[in-house]
Amino acid sequence: IDTEKSKVIKRLLLPNGSTDVKSVTTDVTGEHAYVTHLLARYQLPTNQVDRGWMYTNALTIVDLKNEKVEATVLLDTPQKGAANPWQVMVSPDNKEICVALSGVHEVCRIDRAKLHDRLAQAKQGVAVTPSYNGWENVMNDAGMLYGIAQYQPVGGKGIRAIAMNGKTLYAAGYFSGDIHVAKGDVFDVQRKLGNNMLASAEGRGNMYFHDATLGFQGWQSCASCHPNDARADGLNWDLLNDGLGNPKNTKSLLLSHQTPPCMVTGIRANAEIAVRSGIKYILFAVTPPSVADDMDAYL
């Protein structure tokens, strides 16, 4: 958008399956923009989550000078998801791209120069990582950040906002009501700030709904398909609860508990059953009964 003329200059399309854009930032020089979003594999049946079968978590790089999408890379690794990326920022020295991974309560720190160098080589057909399989498959390669990214556990719950002052990195826990500070490779200072949402069933349910660590390898949370307070991702998914081969649009969960039966075909008798089935068959998780009870309270 041209802010002086209040005019749209160009629309840039993210890859097919992109949803839930959460943050955009630029580097210090204004040459590139970085966008966090999810990348759904909605053409596949929902029978597993291994290696990002259903959802992957992405960073798209935009060439601002030429007004085009340069590349999309996955923040995930082959064995571990980086669910629900939220804020992205570039360090003041222009050396790092930092991403708040809200679903797994971590911060991903990427060497910016090495990332751009790796992408330039990959575009020329150079096998830049052991998993490289051609430029057209970069956005499907969970190994693209191998060796150039650090994943730092924060300690708080729901890391949605980050900031940097010099070499000091700050990360805010939305649900835990705290700020964590890292002056190196470890977040070792915690400061309580504001309200801890985990004191109530509704607050805990909200946190569980956004918590990918409940599920297998942290690839996705309930909020991956139902972002923005349990609404819809706008995609068609083929769930197995009513057979294969009949993809249907994701439903908003607003008032689902008050309007049984649930799912498009009414295959679930009520929302309580649907919540527990989702934990088992979409997150591929086994959780204490209190987790589903708290999710019910939130929804």
Task: For every predicted segment, state its role.
Residues I1-R11, D20-R51, Y55-A58, V62-L299:
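Periplasmic c-type cytochrome electron-transfer domains
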